[in-house]
């Protein structure tokens, strides 16, 4: 599993960019941190024009390379699997 400080970084960046939901997916869910080559995330409801800035900051701040999948738009079978099998690590709440 990804270390807590790395999760905290990703969540902080998600909040900064107004992300709706952030999921941890892939090998970081079940492998030991030293066995993970990169972090895989999926994101939903990123405000228009912020996706690449959000992704760029993740790439700069995280200790490993990052892959990011955009779940916005029509839900497909692939996206449904990601949501079902991934771990929701952040969800924006209505204030």
Please provide the spans of the model-predicted regions.
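Short, well-ordered beta-strand segments
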Residues: 40-42
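Catalytic core of pol beta-like nucleotidyltransferases
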Residues: 1-23, 29-35, 44-95
